[in-house]
Design a protein with these regions (language model features):
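An alpha-helical repeat/solenoid feature that recognizes helix-turn-helix modules
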Residues: 1-10, 25-62, 75-109, 119-166, ...
């Protein structure tokens, strides 16, 4: 298998080769594949890796994709799974995090849209309660809440503000401190909410998250590339030494073309999905690959590309 630097470099080659018309698209087996949500997810992941890994040409491509993302914001302030889909809080939060991560101003209308998806329990639902989809999802979703909490805590895009307190209270009661946590809205990975929640907690304050991660690991194996990438993000965030062996396992899963096997599973939970759309993987391998790249780049044993001669 490749070392970390070579794995990240090959992964970026694969990722940018799959970019079309200023955006990324995946889940092509669906009747309406995802372009908006996938592009927002990719850009948010790329914003978390050192800029030196990208280089000037790819940074320019990222800026073009950010401009595309801004251009397709809905009139309600949100973004959806694709250009035709109803706006939802998860897609909107990923778009906001992509913009903020690249030091662009997050439109206030985006935070207002997410706030409209607030539920009485303090959590954030995927859709506004008054929408047809929102009426089918009357409670908050832990993954959407964890993702949106930092956006609401810094709605102007300014870093350093505390996460939304009502959202964090919901996460404690409905995910951290229960043996029957609420299910995720879209991304079906046992480590997804945990990885998002760790981005709200400093390592020294993350003992409840560590306990939940240990619980998840006790009865779940990270047996696919997407789960392995999210597990690596969790272990790195908690500064656990096991991250080095998990990173090695993730590198062994990389394909010769630089991508990782399709394993990011989603469910279209709007209530309008056909049976064939209830559990689809990223057949273009974009989502799994960018998750793996980001996890490896953040792993503590990755040397700086500047010190290693660059990519």
């Amino acid at each position: 298998p490749r070392d970390n630097q070579a794995a990240i470099s090959a992964g970026l080659d694969f990722l940018f080769a799959g970019r079309r018309h200023h955006n990324w698209s995946d889940f092509s087996a669906l009747q309406d594949p995802s372009d908006t949500w996938v592009t927002a997810f990719v850009l948010a992941q790329l914003a978390q890796i050192p800029a030196d890994w990208l280089g000037n040409a790819r940074e320019q491509q990222v800026r073009q994709s950010l401009e595309w993302l801004l251009s397709v914001q809905g009139s309600d302030g949100g973004w959806g799974f694709n250009l035709r889909a109803e706006s939802d809080a998860e897609s909107t939060a990923w778009a906001a995090r992509a913009l903020r991560g690249c030091r662009l101003r997050v439109p206030e209308s985006a935070a207002r849209f997410i706030e409209r998806c607030r539920r009485s329990d303090g959590g954030i639902g995927a859709y506004a309660p008054e929408s047809p989809s929102g009426r089918a999802w009357s409670i908050g979703s832990p993954d959407v809440t964890a993702l949106a909490a930092s956006v609401l805590g810094s709605s102007s895009g300014a870093p350093g503000r505390a996460p939304d307190p009502a959202a964090t209270d919901f996460l404690r009661s409905c995910w951290l401190q229960t043996n029957r946590p609420l299910p995720a809205f879209r991304v079906q990975s046992r480590f997804y909410t945990c990885a998002l929640l760790l981005e709200l907690e400093a390592p020294e304050g993350a003992w409840p998250v560590l306990e939940k991660l240990c619980e998840l690991m006790s009865w779940n194996k990270a047996d696919n590339a997407f789960d392995q990438a999210l597990l690596l993000r969790c272990l790195t965030g908690l500064q656990i030494q096991k991250s080095a062996s998990v990173a090695a396992g993730l590198r062994r899963m990389q394909r010769p073309d630089g991508g990782w096997p399709a394993s990011a599973l989603i469910t279209l939970a709007s209530g309008r999905a056909s049976g064939s759309e209830m559990g689809q993987s990223d057949d273009q391998r974009i989502v799994t690959t960018v998750a793996a790249i980001c996890a490896l780049a953040q792993c503590k044993d990755v040397a700086s590309p500047v010190k290693m001669g660059g990519i």
